[in-house]
Amino acid sequence: MQCPFCNHGELKVIDSRNAPEANAIKRRRECLKCSQRFTTFETVELTLQVLKRDGRYENFQESKLIHGLNAASSHTRIGQDQVHAIASNVKSELLGKQNREISTKEIGELVMKYLKKADMIAYIRFACVYRRFKDVGELMEVLLSATPDMEK
């Protein structure tokens, strides 16, 4: 690692802390040449392979997960902090699995689990895209299962 200010390669760590909200270790560093201080975050590299619907494999990309969450939660009470928290929870659950190959179905189900707790509108929006409903009946099944108190 190099100093972002002078590109010198010798640094010392001043402070280290867990940053559980980011699933990371936060380190305060100081350059031994220019004495500038800066913060770095060390995270676990996610090496999951995602099995797509068409049979291809792709590296897991948290940015795609966040994009999907943003689309589903647009104009709802879910803010960016909660979007990132949901993405972090999904990522943590995926990392906790023994298998490093995960299907888009498993990812989608995890996202739906968290969205259902957070906001029903975001949950329904995500379900519409993720489940690719073929007719209104399929959508009605999700609506009725999402609102168990509603009369059928």
Swiss-Prot record:
One of its GO terms (biological process) is negative regulation of DNA-templated transcription. A zinc finger (unnamed) spans 3-34. Binds 1 zinc ion. PROSITE patterns: ATP_CONE. Its cofactor is Zn(2+). It comes from the Bacteria. One of its GO terms (molecular function) is zinc ion binding. Signal peptide: none annotated. Keywords: ATP-binding, DNA-binding, Metal-binding, Nucleotide-binding, Repressor, Transcription, Transcription regulation, Zinc, Zinc-finger. InterPro entries: ATP-cone_dom (IPR005144), NrdR-like_N (IPR055173), RNR_NrdR-like (IPR003796). Residues 48-138 form the ATP-cone domain. Negatively regulates transcription of bacterial ribonucleotide reductase nrd genes and operons by binding to NrdR-boxes. Belongs to the NrdR family. HAMAP family: NrdR. This is Transcriptional repressor NrdR. It comes from Chlamydia pneumoniae. The lineage of its organism: Bacteria, Pseudomonadati, Chlamydiota, Chlamydiia, Chlamydiales.
